[in-house]
Regions:
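Generic structural signal for alpha-helix termini and adjacent loop/cap motifs
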Residues: 30, 59-60, 89-92
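C-type cytochrome heme c attachment motif
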Residues: 19-30, 40-41, 52-55, 78-84
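Sequence/structural segment immediately N-terminal to covalent heme-attachment motifs in c-type
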Residues: 9-33, 43-45, 94-96
Length: 96
């Protein structure tokens, strides 16, 4: 029974994911900290959430013109790897 990257066998490869960020980094940044107010930060995001979101963008279940175009050519492995990379980034949150 496979899960959304919650099963270790389904988990992506963060190193491979970093190599696949050519398109992603344009909006979300290589470090996952977006400088684009229209694109969310992905650094430190929950891996299973990223897998679910990218899978839904790819299928068209989730709508965003840019993301639907970008995600349509991603394989399951690409999605798992990119999600693993962004989830692996440590984000320090400072108190206000």
């Amino acid at each position: 029974m496979g899960g959304l990257a919650s099963d270790p066998a389904d988990a992506g490869d963060a190193r491979a994911g970093r190599q696949k960020l050519t398109t992603c980094q344009g909006c979300h940044g290589l470090d996952g900290l977006s400088k684009n107010p229209e694109a969310p930060n992905l650094a430190g995001q929950v891996e299973s959430y990223l897998v679910k979101s990218l899978t839904e963008y790819r299928s068209g279940e989730r709508k965003n013109e840019s993301m639907n175009i970008v995600a349509k050519d991603l394989s399951d492995e690409d999605i798992a790897d990119v999600a693993a990379y962004y989830a692996s980034i440590q984000v320090d949150v400072l108190p206000p």
